[in-house]
Amino acid sequence: MAMPTLDPNAPDFTRRYPNLADPRLGAVATFATDEFFAPKDRMLNPEPAVFIPGKYDDHGKWMDGWETRRRRNGGYDHCIVKLARPGVVKGVDIDTSHFTGNFPPAASIDAAYLPHGEPTDATQWTEIVPSTTLQGNSHHYLDVFGTHAYTHLRVNIYPDGGIARLRVYGQPQVDWKGADRATLFDLAAMENGAYVVEVNNQHFGLASSLLMPGRGINMGDGWETRRRREPGNDWCIIALAHPGRIRKIEVDTAHFKGNFADRVSLQAARVTGGTDATLKTQAMFWQTLLPEQKLQMDHQHYYEAELADLGPVTHVRFNMFPDGGVSRLRLWGALE
């Protein structure tokens, strides 16, 4: 797995919200009017788009994205994407990386809420991204305003061409009110709405990988920092999906062998004021939820008796000593 590029110019919504069009969370491209040159599912690939000079297939130049044939009969192409979770869309990235003479001149996005089925000709769509001029080989970060949750998107390209990647950033909708208070939920799961607020280093792997479902597929699918050459330790701050009392923790070092974190600990707090930006300082003084624990390579570590009862918390600071990698972090808790 390639290390996703962290775009310093990307808007805040790309860091604050999960990508609801991520196939690792369950998103799928269900239909396209045409995919002659490149299949629709490639557009949702979580890895950055690549260009391979000289690579051709039976349909022509191989492109890393969704690409339709040249239209000669009017009209335009579209692709339907089922989101991983129903969610309120906050922003999108229409990425035309490596598409230069074959990108669509414009695109728009419609949305629908269909919790029990797939779109039909009778589906009522709502425009969430109006027709927008596109450039070749570029990211197009577009804010989306609204409070309605959606399950499906229709990506329209005018009239044809290719999109390398589609990212749909939004707040997952979870029915917490109807949830059983006696059941333990993974409050650090991205699919439930948890997100990374701040991280001191993610040179080799993104901290957000800690929150992904399933076990890591390889060493690149986890949080890994550079080699520390000075005193201190590495850390990240995570906002939980819902306030809760943490009862069980899993720290998984899958695939990390010569570079796993030597030890880890967790601090936690119930944050009632301030902003995400102020947590970096506050977190240094949070109470200890899990004292330092020695880790093993390529292993799932579980903790229950070791946890302090801090009551309901909203945020945790995950500390690695002194550096290294961890694949996944699970924080099972009872809802407040």
From Swiss-Prot:
Keyword Oxidoreductase tagged: no
Pathway: Nitrogen metabolism; (S)-allantoin degradation; (S)-ureidoglycolate from allantoate (aminidohydrolase route): step 1/1
Known EC number: 3.5.3.4
Alphabetical keyword list: Hydrolase, Purine metabolism
Keyword NAD part of the UniProt annotation: no
Reaction equation(s) it catalyzes: allantoate + H2O = (S)-ureidoglycolate + urea
SUPFAM superfamilies in the cross-refs: Galactose-binding domain-like (SSF49785)
Top class in the EC scheme: hydrolase
GO BP terms in the entry: allantoin catabolic process; purine nucleobase metabolic process
HAMAP family (UniProt xref): Allantoicase (MF_00813)
Record family assignment: Belongs to the allantoicase family.
Name of this protein: Probable allantoicase
Organism: Ralstonia nicotianae (strain ATCC BAA-1114 / GMI1000) (Ralstonia solanacearum)
Gene designation per UniProt: alc
